[in-house]
Structures are given as structure tokens and as C-alpha cells.
Design a protein with these regions (language model features):
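Condensing-enzyme catalytic core mediating Claisen C-C bond formation in acyl metabolism
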Residues: 1-49, 152-219, 223, 227, ...
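Claisen-condensing/thiolase-fold acyl-transfer catalytic domains that form or cleave C-C bonds
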Residues: 54, 58-61, 65, 85-86, ...
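Phosphate/pyrophosphate-binding loops at sites that engage ATP/ADP/AMP, CoA/4′-phosphopantetheine
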Residues: 60-76, 227-244, 292-297
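Buried hydrophobic positions in well-ordered alpha/beta secondary-structure cores of metabolic enzymes
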Residues: 7-9, 35, 64, 78, ...
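Short beta-strand segments
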Residues: 8, 81, 112, 135-142, ...
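Flexible, glycine-rich active-site loops centered on histidine and acidic residues
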Residues: 126-130, 134-163
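Glycine/charged-rich beta-loop-alpha catalytic/anionic-binding loops adjacent to active sites
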Residues: 41-43, 76-80, 99-112, 145-151, ...
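A contiguous, well-structured pocket-lining segment that forms one wall/lid of small-molecule binding clefts
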Residues: 205-274
Length: 330
């Protein structure tokens, strides 16, 4: 029997080391003023030598489980979304997280939709939880600092490291309402890393460094996010003014400003934290969700909409009702 599903808890983790724009400008031909004006980013968190997608993800997972009041042994599935896993393709980072948190009864899988990963993972987790009636953990964790070329000022200024997580559980009341996923595979070479079986690393570039065609990505990102928002609203018969919180992927402030303009709303209508965390790829949305939750701004019954785009080119969004935690005041 299919059941209602809600987000029962969230968690996140940001590495303690912070790299400011001024620090970057000491080794790159750029300035703090230029980076802020073109991206909205002022700083980013960078993983330490002993940190990785799995270690950061495990911390975020523990925080989410504590928030939900769920023991690791209760989990039926651990889904990790990452494009910077500890190993090249296998073993899955999900297995490493499962072992670290003691989720001995959970199945594990990695999912890679790049920056859209969490929205896709949330959709998969919702379906599994509805079918099996047991808690599911979604973790999005990225060590982007390990895959950017720190001499390429067009990309290294954009990214940061971190992890976010959410626990989904069966619910008496509707929580998760709608998902919308899509892709345009013709844009696969707009954002990529050469280091796979078909495309070995280019010897003239940093090993496996991320390559991005910014001029191609920007218009796609704006169209995809605007289109997703409008589609989810239309498919659920919802008005934008009825949505309490819009949480977009934190890729670039200019992208969010362009989406807001096309939606005819102020950019402040979106939750924005890119200035302090930069683009953390698939971890972007769950980090923002956790920060918003812990700020106290989300009330029981609030309608929330997430939207993201990423390499592939892929995109995804979710709509859900926020439900108060046990012990929380309504």
C-alpha cells in the first residue's frame, strides 16, 4: 500500500576551512569585487586533507538522523548523490556512508545528476519510502575543490565543498507532493570531466579537472529553472504566492536574478546563501534546506519548492509540505 511521505529531518556539514575571494585573488588574476559582482560569491568552504565526500556526508547524515529522531538501523535505503565520490565509480560512496553511520539494514546506491542530484535523489527516495513504508536517507556530498583547476579562474571561483542530508519517513499527513525531473542530453559537453573510460584525462589540463562552457550553461540554467517552477505550479494547481519557500540550486547569483526577472518576482523571493557557501553542486539544495529549517523560518504546513539544474544537462524539482518535528511547537 502506497503511503504519504514527509521529510522528517535534515542535516548539513561545511568544512571549517574558508577560502575568501581575497585569498584566491592572491594567486589568480581576479579581485573580490569582480567575483562578487559576477557571481555573488564572497567565500567558499574547502575540505581538509582527511575529508572527502563520504566523511562529510556521514556527518550531515548523522545530523539529519538526530533531527528526525531515527536510528541508523531503521533505515531501509541510503542514497548518496555525488559527482566527487571517494573512489572512481566503485565502491559507491553510499556504502562508505552506510558503514560510517551504522545503517546495517539499509541498501545503498549512488546517484549522479551533478548539481541536480539532490532533487533527483529525493524523488527516488520518496518512491522507495512510499512503496516499502520504511525510512530512507538521502545524502548529497561534494568535494568540488578536488576536481576544479585552481588556475582556471572561470571555474575555481565558483565552487565549494560541503554536504546536506534529509531523512524521509512514512507520514499520516501529506508531505512530499510532487517531483519533476528532466534532461537535455545534447548539452552533455557543456559541463564535464575528462577521466572516464571513454574520455581519458587530457594531459594538457589538470587531471580530471572540471570543464564548463559558461556561455552555454547560463541560458539553459535560466530556462530550465523557470520552466521547472512554472511546470510544477501548473501540474499541482498551485500559485507561486502560495509557496512559502523557494530553494534553488546556488550556482550563480546572476542566474537566480535572471530567473526571478522572468518570473516577475524579486530575487529575495528565493532562499540564497551562495555568498557564504558558493556552488556546492548536489549538496547546494539540502544545505540550504537545512539552514532554512534550523533558522526557524519554516513553519508546519509551509509549502516548499526546490529546483536545480546540472551537468547532463539535467534538471529537477520537488514540492512538499513542511511538517513540524516531534517536540516542536506549531
Amino acid at each position: 500500500m502506497l503511503q504519504n511521505v514527509r521529510i522528517a529531518g535534515t542535516g548539513s556539514y561545511l568544512p571549517p576551512r574558508i577560502v575568501t575571494n581575497d585569498e584566491l585573488s592572491s594567486s589568480l588574476d581576479t579581485t573580490d569585487e569582480w567575483i562578487v559582482s559576477h557571481t555573488g560569491i564572497r567565500q567558499r568552504h574547502v575540505a581538509g586533507p582527511e575529508e572527502s565526500a563520504s566523511t562529510m556526508g556521514a556527518i550531515a547524515a548523522r545530523n539529519a538522523l538526530e533531527d528526525a529522531g531515527i536510528a541508523p538501523e531503521e533505515l531501509s535505503l541510503v542514497v548518496v548523490t555525488t559527482c566527487t565520490g571517494d573512489y572512481a565509480n566503485f565502491p559507491s560512496t553510499a556504502c562508505l556512508v552506510q558503514n560510517a553511520i551504522g545503517a546495517a539494514n539499509a541498501g545503498c546506491m549512488d546517484l549522479n545528476a551533478a548539481c541536480a542530484g539532490f532533487t533527483c535523489g529525493l524523488s527516488m527516495a520518496r518512491a522507495y519510502c512510499r512503496l516499502h513504508g520504511r525510512p530512507v536517507l538521502v545524502v548529497s556530498s561534494e568535494a568540488m575543490s578536488r576536481v576544479v583547476d585552481w588556475q582556471d579562474r572561470s571555474t575555481c571561483i565558483l565552487f565549494g565543498d560541503g554536504a546536506g542530508a534529509a531523512v524521509l519517513t512514512p507520514s499520516d499527513e501529506p508531505g512530499m507532493i510532487h517531483d519533476c525531473l528532466g534532461a537535455d542530453g545534447s548539452g552533455a559537453r557543456s559541463i564535464y570531466r575528462e577521466c572516464g573510460a571513454r574520455l581519458p584525462a587530457d594531459p594538457h589540463k589538470a587531471p580530471g579537472a572540471l570543464v564548463m562552457q559558461g556561455r552555454a550553461v547560463f541560458p539553459f540554467a535560466v530556462r530550465a529553472m523557470e520552466g521547472l517552477i512554472r511546470k510544477m505550479l501548473a501540474e499541482t494547481g498551485t500559485r507561486l504566492e502560495d509557496v512559502a519557500h523557494v530553494i534553488p540550486h546556488q550556482a550563480n547569483l546572476r542566474i537566480l536574478e535572471a530567473v526571478a526577472k522572468r518570473m516577475d518576482v524579486p530575487v529575495e523571493r528565493f532562499f540564497i546563501n551562495i555568498g557564504s557557501v558558493a556552488n556546492t553542486s548536489s549538496a547546494s539544495v539540502p544545505i540550504a534546506l537545512d539552514q532554512l529549517s534550523r533558522s526557524g523560518a519554516m513553519k508546519d504546513g509551509d509549502l516548499v519548492l526546490t529546483v536545480a539544474f546540472g551537468a547532463g544537462l539535467s534538471f529537477g524539482g520537488n514540492m512538499f509540505r513542511w511538517r513540524k518535528r516531534a517536540g516542536e511547537k506549531t
